[in-house]
From Swiss-Prot:
Record's protein name: Putative pterin-4-alpha-carbinolamine dehydratase
Family classification: Belongs to the pterin-4-alpha-carbinolamine dehydratase family.
Enzymatic class: lyase
Coiled-coil zones: none
Enzyme Commission (EC) number: 4.2.1.96
Transmembrane regions: none
Molecular function terms from GO: 4-alpha-hydroxytetrahydrobiopterin dehydratase activity
Reactions mediated catalytically: (4aS,6R)-4a-hydroxy-L-erythro-5,6,7,8-tetrahydrobiopterin = (6R)-L-erythro-6,7-dihydrobiopterin + H2O
Pfam families xref list: Pterin_4a
PANTHER family in alphabetical order: PTERIN-4-ALPHA-CARBINOLAMINE DEHYDRATASE-RELATED (PTHR42805:SF1)
């Protein structure tokens, strides 16, 4: 069982390495609901969360925002009626770092 959800983000600099393909495959097993996507040439993790109404989706996005502030690592969030789409990636390195998988796991715990 993964402990990604219990981990915190490490400081990341612009020269930090992106996760390797092998690391991605291992880490994805810990966040199976998340998909790898490419947006604007950068690989990202994305998941769509569904809710019964707008208010529940909004409350969830507020929890994700609080988590992001706590960790100093911020996602893209699209809030719509009955759903919220969350995308994690590390802006400084233009792709995926282990921090993104940690935040995906922690986001899952909020759902």
């Amino acid at each position: 069982m993964s402990n990604l959800g219990q981990q915190s983000c490490s400081a990341c600099s612009a020269d930090a390495p992106q996760v390797t393909d092998a690391e991605k495959q291992t880490l994805l097993k810990d966040v199976p609901e998340w998909q790898l996507i490419v947006q604007d040439g950068e690989e990202q993790l994305q998941r769509v969360f569904t809710f019964k109404n707008f208010v529940q989706a909004q409350a969830f996005t507020n929890k994700v925002a609080d988590l992001a502030e706590e960790e100093g690592h911020h996602p893209a969030i699209l809030l719509e009626w009955g759903k919220a789409t969350v995308r994690w990636w590390t802006h400084k390195i233009g792709g995926l770092h282990k921090n993104d998988f940690i935040m995906a796991a922690r986001t899952d715990e909020l759902y």
